[in-house]
Amino acid sequence: MIELSFLSVARFSGPDAGSFLQAQLSADIAVLASGKAAFACYCSPRGQVISLLLVCREGDEYLVAGASALLPAVLRRLGMFVLRSKVEFAIQSGMKIFGQAVEDPPSIGGSVFKPEAVGLAYLLSDQPQLANGSEDDWKLMELNNNVTWLEPATSEKFIPQMLGFDNIGAVSFSKGCYPGQEIVARARYLGKVKRKPLLVATAQELWVEPGQTIELLRAEQWTAATVVDSVFVRDTGTLLFTVAPEKPEDTPSRVRYGAHDYLCATI
C-alpha cells in the first residue's frame, strides 16, 4: 500500500450532490452505484481538461479525489455553478488516499474503490495505514494504465481524447451536457483528434518538467511531443507520458531533450 500525498479528497453531500456532479463532469455519474468509482474530467467550456478526478460514491455522498495542486481551484470554480442546487462540498483535510494492488485484502478503517477501466485500486481513509511502497512505483503503474493527474502546467491544455481519458472510462458520449461537451463530442465524431497519448521510455534518468517539449525520432524524422507526466524508477529507467502526433505505425527509437539524446527502451 502506498500513500499518495499528491492527491487530495473532497466530499460532496446534499440531495443534489449526484445531479450536480452529473451536470459538471464528463463521466456518467448517474449510473455510479454506492461503493463504486469512476474517473471523470472537469473540462473548460473549450473542452480542455482542467483536472482528472476520481469520483467515489458512498451512499448518497461522493468522495472526489484530484491533484492537490488543482483541487482547491476546481472546487472554487464549481462553487460558481451551485446556484439553487442543494449541494455542499469541501476538501477533507483528515482524509488520505492510498494506492493498493487490486488483489490486496481489504484494509481496516477505510473504503476501497476500484475503477472498472483500470487495474488499480484506491483506499480512502481518515485512519492511519501501514504504507510500504514509493509514490514513484505507484506512478509507474498509473502511467501504464493511462492515468495522469495533470498539474497547473498541463491543466487546460488538452481535450480528454488527447490524454486517452476516454479509454479509462472518464468520458461518456451518451450522457447529457457538461462544460465542453459539444467540443469533446465533435472531436470524436469528426475524427479531429490528431494527437494522442504516447508512452516513451528510456533506460537513463531523464528529468523533464510537465508541459515541456521533447523530440522523438519516428520513422527517421524528429517530431515534437509534450510531456504531461514522468517518473524515474531506480534500476529501471524513465517513463514519460507524452501527447504526440498520432502515428500508430511509428514507434519512437530515440528521445531528445536539450543536450540529452537517448535510445528508447521498454519499461
Each model region followed by its residue ranges:
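Anionic-ligand-binding alpha/beta catalytic cores of soluble enzymes and soluble regulatory domains
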Residues: 122-201
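A common structural junction motif
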Residues: 28-29, 78-87, 130-137, 218-223, ...
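Short, conserved charged micro-motifs
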Residues: 16-21, 71-75, 104-107, 127-132, ...
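Short amphipathic beta-strand starts and helix->beta connectors
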Residues: 40-52, 83, 104-110, 184, ...
